[in-house]
């Protein structure tokens, strides 16, 4: 028996062997002076990234509490709330699928900002989702959300009241359909005229001197086409007038010289004694030597 007891008993280190017949407990042998300090190692590399991502996932997920009804299963709830069965098991500490049927309510992990987290008024006979938050900060923020929802509801109620007052002020009751159509057409015409009056531009707007696009096109045509054409026509008219003036002057001068020569021949005078009128209108007498010859001939 002693051999069996020694074989089955745990072997302790040599320095901590108990005395004969005594029992040794590890808690009693260690004193308060031998307290070990535990240091948390800082993660690095992939472990750090993995922990940060898991922490972000936990921060971005909230829990919705759903009352289990007859016919609900884990797969159906996972499909309904777009989450995995493993996440539901992990949140509810479920080991097997059969443990689900022992619960009255179940926690469902959903994303923080999603359609499922919006607050709606559920009708009778439907399940009411109660969000279960991870941190107290989210619980403190919930009253602010409720106050914001209340203010939004009050604003919408005021808008409804204003609409009702406008409907009461405007008497839209008509006896037949034609009156209704005419009234709606008149309102549409009024709206169109108001829109057009808003779109009309000030005629005295200083950027374009109050002219339209067609006026600018006409001005460009006048400057670019009409003005050069008039200038060319005027230049041609001036050239023709100068040419005609010179031709008339030359013809008149030739006619005068021809008439004077004919008269001198008729009176017996030589053209040498005539007066020379140049083209510039200056009077120049010819040389007088031929005149002496003429006188000599008359004397003889």
Curated annotation (Swiss-Prot):
Keyword set, alphabetical order: Cell membrane, Glycoprotein, Golgi apparatus, Membrane, Transmembrane, Transmembrane helix
Which InterPro entries does the record cross-reference, listed alphabetically?
A: LYSM1-4 (IPR045030), LysM_dom (IPR018392), LysM_dom_sf (IPR036779)
Which residues face the membrane's Cytoplasmic side?
234-300
How would you describe this protein's topology in the membrane? Answer: Single-pass membrane protein
Q: Which residues form the LysM domain?
A: 64-108
Q: Which residues cross the membrane?
A: 213-233
Q: Enumerate the glycosylated residues.
A: 149, 170
Q: Which GO terms describe its biological process?
A: Golgi organization
GO CC terms of this entry: Golgi apparatus; plasma membrane
Which PANTHER family has this protein been placed in?
AND PUTATIVE PEPTIDOGLYCAN-BINDING DOMAIN-CONTAINING PROTEIN 3-RELATED, LYSM AND PUTATIVE PEPTIDOGLYCAN-BINDING DOMAIN-CONTAINING PROTEIN
Protein name in UniProt = LysM and putative peptidoglycan-binding domain-containing protein 3
- Give the organism, scientific name: Gallus gallus (Chicken)
Q: What is the lineage of its organism?
A: Eukaryota, Metazoa, Chordata, Craniata, Vertebrata
